[in-house]
């Protein structure tokens, strides 16, 4: 009564097998894919579980070590900036290629010469005690000309080296003092011209000041002259009238009779 009327089996976990799924003809038509039964050319023959495998261990330092190294470098840079620590500058050594080039310039084999025997641009300061400048070289240095100080130093020492005869001064060295005197005379001429110009400017300023003082000084007071109005006929009449008004009437009559 409780059993199924249909034939066959509904299927359970004990009756399921992945091999049957792989070999099924209609597998590609089923919805969904599974790693246990890959389908198609993109899944067959490929490692589908590559992401789950362990990776190779990193050979580099760990994150904590990197952070500690960065903090230490920052601390050293801060101390150097504040002046609590002296920065050590590592000298850059010569490479093999540079050494071979220097030997080629000198014109010898690199095996015959050592690095200590080669004198470069910085050798003048180190061998200043051994190289004595001549009087001509000193004069040239005063004028600002370049002085050749690269002398070859023998390994035996300066005492055993034969003293070379002193060279005679060349014509170029003789010309240098003349050029110096010519420059001095030019400078003196320029100074004289400047002094003359200054003197002229001073004179012009003095003349201008005198002219300004003359123009600004008040003019001398002119003698008082009689006004123009005093000579006019109206003023004459007024004066006569005032004089007549001051006289007695009897006098006025006498004057009029005398005028008649």
UniProtKB/Swiss-Prot annotation:
Keywords, comma-separated and alphabetical: Isopeptide bond, Phosphoprotein, Ubl conjugation
Residues annotated with Phosphoserine modification: 123, 127, 215-216, 219
Sequence ranges of Low complexity compositional bias: 117-132
Basic and acidic residues composition-biased segments: 106-116, 170-182
Cited InterPro entries: MMTA2_N, MMTAG2-like
Highest taxon of the lineage: Eukaryota
Chain spans, region Disordered: 1-21, 106-133, 146-260
Keyword tRNA processing on entry: no
Chain residue numbers at which the record places covalent cross-link Glycyl lysine isopeptide (Lys-Gly) (interchain with G-Cter in SUMO2): 22, 104, 113
Pfam families the record matches: MMtag
Basic residues bias: start-end ranges: 183-206
Biased composition (Gly residues): 1-11
Name assigned to this protein: Multiple myeloma tumor-associated protein 2 homolog
Origin species: Mus musculus
Protein encoded by which gene: Mmtag2
């Amino acid at each position: 009564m409780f059993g199924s009327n249909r034939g066959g089996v509904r299927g359970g976990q004990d009756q399921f097998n992945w091999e049957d799924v792989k070999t099924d003809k209609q597998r590609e038509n089923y919805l969904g894919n599974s790693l246990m039964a890959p389908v198609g050319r993109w899944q067959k023959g490929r490692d589908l579980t590559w992401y789950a495998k362990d990776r190779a261990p990193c050979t580099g330092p760990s994150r904590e070590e990197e952070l500690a190294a960065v903090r230490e470098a920052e601390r050293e840079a801060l101390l150097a900036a504040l002046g609590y620590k002296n920065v050590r500058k590592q000298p850059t050594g010569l490479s093999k290629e540079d050494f071979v080039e220097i030997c080629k310039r000198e014109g010898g084999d690199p095996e015959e010469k050592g690095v200590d025997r080669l004198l470069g641009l910085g050798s003048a300061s180190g061998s200043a005690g051994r190289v004595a400048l001549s009087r001509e070289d000193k004069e040239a240095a005063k004028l600002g000309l370049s002085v050749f100080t690269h002398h070859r130093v023998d390994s035996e020492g300066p005492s055993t080296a034969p003293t070379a005869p002193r060279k005679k001064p060349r014509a170029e060295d003789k010309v240098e003092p003349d050029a110096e005197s010519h420059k001095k005379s030019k400078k003196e001429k320029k100074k004289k011209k400047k002094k003359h110009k200054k003197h002229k400017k001073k004179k012009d300023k003095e003349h201008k000041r005198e002219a300004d003082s003359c123009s600004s000084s008040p003019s001398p007071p002119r003698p008082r002259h009689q006004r123009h109005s005093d000579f006019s006929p109206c003023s004459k009449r007024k004066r006569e009238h005032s004089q007549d008004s001051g006289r007695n009437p009897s006098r006025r009559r006498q004057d009029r009779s005398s005028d008649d």
